[in-house]
Amino acid sequence: MASRLLLPFLVVFNPVTAQGLGGLWPVPQPTFNSGSTPVFINQDIKVTYNGASLAHEANLEPAALTSSDITAAGVSRALDNIFNQNFVPWMLVPRYSLSSYEPVANASAAAVSCLEITLTGGNTTFDPTATDVDEAYSLSIGEDGTAKLSSKSTFGILHGLETFSQLFYEHSAGGVWYLVNAPIEIEDAPVYGHRGLMLDTARHFFPVDDIKRTIDGLSYNKLNKLHVHVTDSQSWPLEIPSIPELSAKGAYSQSSVYSPDDIKSIQEYGLARGVEVYFEIDMPGHIGVVGEAFPDLVVAYDARPYFFYCAQPPCGAFRLNDSNVETFLGNLFDDILPRVAPYSKYWGTGGDELNANDSRFDPGLNTNDSAVLQPLLQTFVDNQHTRVRNAGLTPTVWEELVTEWNVTLGSDVVVQSWLGGGAVAEIASKGHKVIDSNYNFWYLDCGRGQWLTFGNEIWAQFTPFNDWCGPTKSWELVYSHDPAEGLNGTEAELVLGGEVAVWSETIDSNNLDSLVWPRAGAAAEVLWSGRTDAGGQNRSQVTAAPRLNAQRQRLVSRGIRASPIQMEWCLQYPNATGCEYPAA
């Protein structure tokens, strides 16, 4: 195949780029230097890995989770995104002026004909359960088309390949791809090591393809964790071969179940894209659905009126002082934990929104006295965390175990905070590592109105039927959140990063993409690049919007149904101030 289509015309190249043209998401830091020279890329580009030629045929998936195989598959995807899933950036330049921004399309222009990839860490083996992975990378593209990418880790290589792919656009003439801003020098590294999204698969079931597409979106935004809240009181979509009754009676349907092969496939798919997938089975609350198969293990299942016993129907919690519950959980964890442990560091044990009133249904307790229940909860948590550790995994929990129940946790346990209002500082001040998911900023399901219905005798009290956590978390609000705000240095060091949350009461396959993207990308830049720039100033929405508009277009071109954040008029305005609200 020809390297480029030779065109019989010349176009004058405008060295001054338009708003989103040449912008990257998330913005590289600490170094992103670029020029104004256009460079093409050859379709028959050669790629080397540590000096050896690297095969990169189309649609390549890694044969094994090795550094070389993962890199080869990453190259395959990056080139596919450049040559087959790219876009002509007419919407990023002033109306009908694309010809002024595209380079001259002729045979004499410089082109990237080889990409040299170097893994500098010295260890070419790949450990998906490794902690403190160095995800930094270096990328350079010269005016002559010389391209080099290096990193100490495989994940860093994948991030660099994503940046490489974002630099190129499709030419309006077709068959030609180019970047606008060589020479390019990038030194890039994340501010936070934990950058993720939590997906609830219990309120609505998401097919494997939806989850894999979400993983694609995470990788395009340099997010590296997918936290799957896999079960809840509403449904149990997880097949446990040794306890088949759980999904047989607890799933919405037998087509709404993740098999062991599905779980393995999802985790491997994620790791091949730099995304660790880890799972959570919330307990001892949020577990009512177990009562469908094992009613003697659960109290207050679907108790009414529900708001006395849980946050939403159906209620249900494990008995806190029952040997049968411990036997059941031993069998459950013996089945699931060894299967996920080779691919992940974490396992979530939940712990949120436990309602003491549930234990009034327990004939062995018949109390809601927290002084009685707290020691039992402590023992329950200790037992589950021992099982998690014995499988080689690190437990994660929700914040209420610390902030409301005063449970003593091991120093390894990671606490996920969601209630805001100084909770991160409180948790960190007690020495716990923290993942921030402040609902005021990072709950992407909020602002969609009530899913509850109200009878004629009471409906007027609840107009206009707002949900509990509105308003909608716009991309600007997501972008404004700093996980370390208000923390002292010691506390800030304990913040591992954050996760945006996608609770699925009103989200399913049909609106997942549009509600997640590109808003999750706004959090991705905060977590990768930092809320503030090198000068200590908050990153500006005004200068971020053109780049996020361009990123949204990339996502759409790559098969993700991302929502627009502005009208096209804003994108095509000659500078970023066209849709900026006047200061005074």
Predicted ranges, named:
Residues M1-A18:
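Fungal secretory targeting signals
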Residues N14-G193, P395-E404, L409, A550-Q553, ...:
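Acidic, contiguous N-terminal accessory segments
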Residues V39-I41, I45-Y49, G196-M198, H227-H229, ...:
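Structural recognition of the beta-strand scaffold that forms the well-ordered cores
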Residues A55-H56, F205-P207, S233-P237, P284-V290, ...:
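Flexible loop/turn segments at secondary-structure boundaries
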Residues F126, A130-C315, N321-G348, E499-W503:
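Feature activates predominantly on carbohydrate-active enzymes
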Residues P295, F307-C310, P314-V413, W418-A428:
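Active-site neighborhood of glycoside hydrolase catalytic domains
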Residues P395, E400-T403, V407-V413, S417-A584:
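Flexible, acidic glycine-rich loops studded with aromatic residues
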